[in-house]
């Protein structure tokens, strides 16, 4: 787990959950100088839960209190840093903008990219830290040539490498993932063994700043109800109905279309500029590949096409594909077999076995008849 056996000053990102708490305990047990930091990124007073209800998210004030108590139990220094403004500008605004542009964003990747492994890393350096650590289920290894590899966590049900594809070599060199070689069951057992008060705490399920999972309400609270109402059309452009806003729809969606039709209809595409939602039968959801932008290669950048596997969403089994690097930091990905619901705005992550090669953001799906510019 640790890059070498020397005692290091390590800043651990503590969410108040069982994973980061056990990671902190493991680092302390290994003899490192551990500093706990919780990031305050969101004002939870904006939401009021029903009596007896608790939102399944991370990073709330209750979670920060849990993290503080764990740090006290472990006898490590603990700080809270306020990143609310940065989180709003870098994560929330991006989330809302993507939906308004007709795409389906992944804010957890953006949070890792800009908050945890950018701002927190800078804060850690300011504290004189040698490394940062998180409770992610992922692994790193250093090759003989000094290059770092990002790898899947050994627990396939918990692997979080998909969310970390934006990491750079510099960031990987300063990052520890103490839980990467463990299963969730083993982590909970360790938490109980350490006597941590969060040993039985539930897991966060929803996006932290949308605790009730109502994206439409959140977007309208952020920006007001958008004037993006328009037509629902079939693949030939025939109007089948109307909608109240393109941001209410995502590729693959079936419910909430409000259209009477002899066969089930699914969202095939969202065109915010035209204010159109295109629908069609289930088999029309399948694509031959995709174009990805803003590619980050963790492995050396390939000069020609490579055979690999890819995931087009988090809970997606890696599928065989051929990746062709294009100009302007783009790539064309061709699947061995047609794949369902390629969704613009989501991340596509490339793998070679357990190793993350890199990844990018899905621009659009590609079908055999789709012209692709390789310029």
From Swiss-Prot:
Keywords: ATP-binding, Cytoplasm, Disulfide bond, Nucleotide-binding, RNA-binding, Transferase, tRNA processing, tRNA-binding
Domain of life: Bacteria
Catalytic activities: S-sulfanyl-L-cysteinyl-[protein] + uridine(34) in tRNA + AH2 + ATP = 2-thiouridine(34) in tRNA + L-cysteinyl-[protein] + A + AMP + diphosphate + H(+)
Region of interest: Interaction with tRNA: 158-160, 313-314
NCBIfam families: PRK00143.1, trmU
PANTHER family: MITOCHONDRIAL TRNA-SPECIFIC 2-THIOURIDYLASE 1, TRNA 5-METHYLAMINOMETHYL-2-THIOURIDYLATE -METHYLTRANSFERASE
Name of the protein described by the UniProt record: tRNA-specific 2-thiouridylase MnmA
Organism from which the protein derives: Geotalea uraniireducens (strain Rf4)
């Amino acid at each position: 787990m640790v890059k070498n056996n020397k005692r290091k000053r390590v800043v651990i990102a503590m969410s108040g959950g069982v994973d980061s708490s056990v990671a902190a305990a493991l680092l302390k047990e290994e003899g490192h100088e551990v500093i706990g930091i919780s990031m305050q990124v969101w004002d939870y007073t904006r939401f009021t839960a029903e009596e007896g209800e608790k939102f399944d998210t991370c990073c709330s004030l209750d979670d920060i209190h849990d993290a503080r108590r764990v740090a006290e139990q472990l006898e490590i220094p603990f700080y809270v840093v306020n990143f609310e403004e940065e989180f709003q500008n870098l994560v929330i605004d991006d989330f809302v903008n993507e939906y308004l542009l007709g795409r389906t964003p992944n804010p957890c990747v953006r949070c890792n990219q800009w908050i945890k492994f950018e701002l927190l890393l800078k804060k850690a350096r300011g504290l004189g830290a040698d490394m940062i650590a998180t409770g992610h289920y992922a692994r790193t290894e250093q090759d003989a040539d000094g290059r770092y590899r990002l790898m899947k966590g050994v627990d396939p049900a918990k692997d979080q490498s998909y969310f970390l594809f934006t990491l750079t070599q510099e960031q990987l060199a300063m990052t520890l993932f103490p839980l990467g070689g463990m299963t969730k069951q083993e982590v909970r057992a360790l938490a109980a063994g350490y006597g941590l008060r969060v040993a039985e705490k539930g897991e966060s399920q929803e996006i932290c700043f949308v605790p009730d999972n109502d994206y439409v309400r959140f977007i309208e609270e952020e920006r007001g109800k958008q004037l993006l109402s328009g037509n629902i059309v079939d693949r030939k452009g025939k109007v089948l109905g109307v909608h109240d806003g393109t941001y209410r729809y995502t590729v693959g969606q079936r419910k909430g279309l409000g259209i009477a039709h002899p066969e089930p209809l699914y969202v095939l595409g969202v065109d915010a500029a035209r204010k159109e939602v295109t629908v069609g039968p289930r088999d029309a959801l399948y694509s031959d590949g995709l174009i990805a932008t803003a590619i980050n290669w963790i492995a050396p950048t390939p000069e020609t096409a490579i055979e690999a596997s890819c995931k087009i969403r988090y809970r997606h089994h890696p599928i065989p594909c051929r990746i062709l690097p294009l100009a302007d930091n783009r790539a064309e990905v061709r699947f061995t077999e047609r794949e369902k619901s390629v969704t613009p705005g989501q991340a596509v992550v490339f793998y070679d076995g357990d190793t993350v090669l890199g990844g990018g953001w899905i621009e659009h799906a590609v079908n055999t008849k789709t012209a692709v510019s390789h310029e």
